[in-house]
């Protein structure tokens, strides 16, 4: 009996030494490094969320890299990157590739953004309907010059889906990115630019209220791109934004995703004027304008 107890005691010591010598995991959801691609439209907001996350979890180091929507999605579907925050959903071709390759990339909707029409701060225009924007984009109207970012941007793809019936916007002046759209509109006083809400809010340009055709059910009502109208679907040019995550195990990518979709992350989304998609948020009452 004593011999058995002695052997058991030695075994316990060996197990204690073995497990005691094992190093704790180097990376967890709140400890480690992450490279995260971010759509240019969403960069200011995501940067603020990253700063908040890093303050709460100081053992994380997140590098944000600004890219176009198409570039980010292609890299994710090819398995080249861990995380991308996108201003648009996958196109039909991208969905087919996703299904064909049995991709393990997780896709999580986290907020609602607005396609915004901006003009010079002194421009007489205050509102516009979607039909007018469509005619400008297709070249059927020359009343204003209209600037949009290039075909790799989320804006370009969103416009094809939401406004031009998948036709190329041959009437638009296509520039490098959303920042360039802002620069062109500031120089060209008789122009309209189409950018994401984050970019519009930082541009010091006038943001137009958007309405639908006067003959439609909601005709005559114009909406500003306020968070409440984005979340409830009333703003005419809404786009859902997504997190694409390609991470095996639970590491910083998973932790950052959880934070973005948590009440803390969604409050930051709201503070930037976008509509939260994962938690219920109270909004200030907004009066519709005609």
Locate predicted features.
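Exported/periplasmic ABC-transporter solute-binding proteins
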Residues: 21-58, 65, 70, 77, ...
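Short, conserved beta-strand segments within well-ordered enzyme catalytic domains
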Residues: 37, 63, 82-85
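Bacterial N-terminal signal peptides
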Residues: 9-18
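Bacterial N-terminal signal peptides that target proteins for export
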Residues: 1-9
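Pocket-flanking alpha-helical
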Residues: 70-101
């Amino acid at each position: 009996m004593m011999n058995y107890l002695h052997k058991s005691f030695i075994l316990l010591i060996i197990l204690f030494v073995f497990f005691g010598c094992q190093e704790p995991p180097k990376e967890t959801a709140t400890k480690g490094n992450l490279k995260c691609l971010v759509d240019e439209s969403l960069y200011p907001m995501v940067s603020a969320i990253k700063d908040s996350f890093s303050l709460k979890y100081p053992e994380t180091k997140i590098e944000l890299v600004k890219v176009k929507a198409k570039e980010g999605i292609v890299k994710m579907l090819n398995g080249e990157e861990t995380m991308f925050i996108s201003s648009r959903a996958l196109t039909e071709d991208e969905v087919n590739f996703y299904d064909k390759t049995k991709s393990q990339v997780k896709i999580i909707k986290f907020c609602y953004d607005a396609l915004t029409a901006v003009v010079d701060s002194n421009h007489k225009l205050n509102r516009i309907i979607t039909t007018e924007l469509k005619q400008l984009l297709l070249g059927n109207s020359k009343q204003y010059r209209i600037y949009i970012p290039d075909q790799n941007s989320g804006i370009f793809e969103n416009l094809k889906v939401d406004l031009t019936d998948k036709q190329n916007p041959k009437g638009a002046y296509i520039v490098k990115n959303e920042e360039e759209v802002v620069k062109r509109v500031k120089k060209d006083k008789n122009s309209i630019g189409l950018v994401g809400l984050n970019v519009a809010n930082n541009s010091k340009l006038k943001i137009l209220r958007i309405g639908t055709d006067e003959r439609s059910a909601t005709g005559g009502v114009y909406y500003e791109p306020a968070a409440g109208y984005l979340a409830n679907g009333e703003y005419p040019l809404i786009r859902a934004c997504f997190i694409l995550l390609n991470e095996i195990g639970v590491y910083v990518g998973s932790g950052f995703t959880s934070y973005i979709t948590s009440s803390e992350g969604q409050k930051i989304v709201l503070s930037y004027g976008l509509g939260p998609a994962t938690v219920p948020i109270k909004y200030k009452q907004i009066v519709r304008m005609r």
